[in-house]
């Protein structure tokens, strides 16, 4: 299994240490073991390679943008099973990651993973986003929902000059969503991701 992870990371030119491979391997195995109990991911994707490619690698496609902007802290909203927050934290260990998840089941899983993977740069926040009072330079979200559903509330959690990085799919759908929220932000940028996964993946950067 570790060889599969190494191949996938190398194919996308990600830099990694052997300990990163070990953590990803353990993380995926824990998801497979506990998915039914914690309702972490879709059952149709509940095999090792699907989790590796559709979730782990996809999450890592945003890492270069985080490093380019270089915030001191990152808030990951609706972390679920930990994508992208846990993955980014593994490969970006010098930065603090806050993972906000309202579901008690999923936040319990995240707390278990944080301890087992020894992720000292991760803090789990278990409550509704409306209760968050802190302001952040950088917010990530990886959700299938329309950006119009969460753009305003996330904007209100941004520091001046901060940005939201949303993982999104097809470009034509993104254009429709961007038109609904373009007046909320000073700048909106769409970055096409160089994915080998044969799926259309983009990042939408929403600047306050």
Swiss-Prot record:
Enzyme class: transferase
Pfam families: GidB (PF02527)
Subcellular location: Cytoplasm
Main location class: cytoplasm
Highest taxon in the source lineage: Bacteria
Transferase listed as a keyword: yes
Gene Ontology MF annotations: rRNA (guanine-N7-)-methyltransferase activity
GO cellular-component term (any): cytosol
Alphabetized UniProt keyword annotations: Cytoplasm, Methyltransferase, rRNA processing, S-adenosyl-L-methionine, Transferase
EC number(s) reported in the record: 2.1.1.-
Binding site for S-adenosyl-L-methionine: 78, 83, 101-103, 129-130, 142
Keyword Cytoplasm: yes
Family: Belongs to the methyltransferase superfamily. RNA methyltransferase RsmG family.
PANTHER family linked: S-ADENOSYL-L-METHIONINE-DEPENDENT METHYLTRANSFERASES SUPERFAMILY PROTEIN
Task performed by this protein: Specifically methylates the N7 position of a guanine in 16S rRNA.
HAMAP family, A to Z: 16SrRNA_methyltr_G (MF_00074)
Protein name: Ribosomal RNA small subunit methyltransferase G
Encoding gene, per UniProt annotation: rsmG
